[in-house]
Regions:
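Helix-to-loop junctions at the C-terminal end of transmembrane segments
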Residues: 79-91, 276-288, 372
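Helix-breaking motifs and short loop linkers at transmembrane-helix boundaries and internal kinks
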Residues: 58, 90, 111-117, 128, ...
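Conserved MFS/SLC helix-loop-helix module at the cytosolic interface between two early adjacent transmembrane helices
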Residues: 77-116
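Juxtamembrane intracellular "pre-TM" segments in multi-pass secondary transporters
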Residues: 14-22, 201-230
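Paired small-residue
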Residues: 101, 105-108, 116-125, 314-322
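Helix-loop-helix hairpin linking two adjacent transmembrane segments in secondary transporters
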Residues: 113-117, 132, 145-203, 250
Length: 432
């Protein structure tokens, strides 16, 4: 089946309510979302498989938990490394190679005879996953108008949300019924389906006439707005996952929710994430800073409420849904913001966003672990998470002020150029 042609991007000047903005997403973007579903399921499914893996591999549960940390660290490191390594390679070819390596990593994990090989397979999978996110995001952005970037990213992030709603619980069910290795086989099969979709539906995106230069791409890191975007993304994600990573013991030990209901509550978080991604993706293109400010503020309020009312089951369960909604409501805007300020290096921008999210996903649980080790209780992880999101909110305010200041400078420069051109075009005055 022939690949779809690349849609012609609409002019950036069209308003968000225009026909271009309302146009349907290319099917290729949904194929990327399907691929992210496989990636996300693999990343998060170990939460429900750790006891079985620990028992089968003869290691402790904390040692098995290092498999999760290894994946997150691999994502942080792998995204920029692979973005640089594949900078001059065709995007479609790179996606095919990365999803293939990722799928083989799942098969290797399913067949791993010992903990060391399973650990190695997780690192390989994480590197491929990170590279796919970075390149896939750049491809998705390239196929849509500038004023539809957040919607395109919402489709990709939606794959991650669906992984939380369906993939992770299904992985746990497979693990309970057929053993933990069956979950790895299932993700391998999903990766194969994604590979077919990429082969048949992702267009060949021509390389730029001038080959990308690493030095030029790295210049984006001189921009304070890029650094602010990195910090905001890491802190916003870290604040949520500081509490979410320990939601199960909080529910069972503090709220006294029956352990059998925990998977349903985790699924409720995923439903909130899916709804938040959908809403955020639709409004972020027109109101990017509004989404960031309102979403991170909401996450802060919900985390504080969780810390205060963690012992009340109904409130704790409701807040699990709301935290998922607010966290993923901001995700499309966080992605789009990075592409807006780092547009001169789209692949590195995607890689930087991936690393930023996973830096938060690593730092947040680490901070939560310190809080628990200090005997402050599971509910205190929500206080720590709220502290992180407050800092993120402050940095968004700084970024907004800087953005307004830069916009005024650009507007004044444009007015001056127009005035100079008008003066040059007017007939010279003739003295009587």
């Amino acid at each position: 089946m022939p690949a779809e042609p690349i849609p012609t991007p609409a002019p950036a000047s069209r308003p968000p309510g225009s026909t271009a903005s309302a146009a349907r997403m290319p099917l290729a973007v949904y194929i990327l979302g399907l691929s992210v579903f496989a990636l996300g399921t693999s990343e998060f499914m170990l939460t429900g498989l750790l006891p079985d893996i620990a028992d089968d591999m003869n290691v402790s549960i904390p040692q098995a938990g290092l498999l999760i940390s290894a994946f997150a660290i691999g994502m942080v490191v792998g995204a920029p490394l692979l973005a640089v390594a594949t900078l001059r390679l065709p995007r479609r070819t790179t996606l095919i190679a990365l999803i293939t390596v990722f799928g083989l990593g799942q098969i290797a994990g399913a067949l791993a005879p010992n903990y060391a090989l399973l650990f190695a397979s997780r690192i390989v999978s994480a590197l491929a996953c990170a590279g796919f996110w970075a390149v896939g995001a750049a491809v998705a952005i390239a196929m849509v108008p500038v004023n539809a970037r957040a919607r395109a990213m919402a489709v990709m992030i939606g794959g991650l949300s669906i992984a939380n709603v369906l993939g992770v619980p299904l992985g746990a069910l497979l693990g309970d019924g057929l053993g933990w290795r069956s979950a790895f086989w299932a993700v391998g099969a999903a990766s194969a389906i994604a590979l077919v979709g990429i082969l048949t539906r992702i267009p060949r995106i021509p390389l730029p006439a001038e080959k990308p230069r690493l030095g030029r791409e790295l210049r984006i890191y001189r921009d304070p707005q890029v650094l602010l975007s990195v910090a905001v993304t890491a802190l916003a994600a870290g604040g949520v996952f500081c509490a979410f990573s320990y939601l199960k013991p909080l529910l069972t030990d503090v709220a006294h929710v029956d352990a059998g209901w925990v998977p349903a509550v985790l699924g409720l978080f995923g439903v909130g994430a899916l709804i938040g991604t959908t809403i955020g993706g639709r409004v972020a293109d027109a109101h990017l800073f509004g989404v960031l400010l309102s979403g991170i503020t909401a996450s802060t309020v919900f985390l504080v409420a969780l810390a205060l009312f963690a012992s009340t089951p109904a409130i704790a369960i409701t807040l699990s849904f709301l935290i998922g909604l607010s966290a993923f409501y901001t995700a499309p805007a966080l992605n789009a913001r990075m592409f807006n300020v780092g547009g001169a290096a789209p692949t590195l921008a995607g890689a930087t966003t991936t690393s930023s999210f996973n830096l938060g996903n690593t730092a947040g649980p680490w901070l939560g672990g310190l809080v628990i080790s200090a005997n402050l209780g599971f509910a205190a992880t929500a206080w720590a998470g709220a502290a992180m999101t407050v800092v993120a909110l402050a940095l968004v305010t700084v970024s907004l002020r800087l953005h307004k200041s830069q916009s005024r400078v650009v507007a004044r420069s444009a007015d001056q150029i127009s005035a100079d051109q008008a003066h040059a075009a007017s007939p010279a005055e003739v003295c009587p």
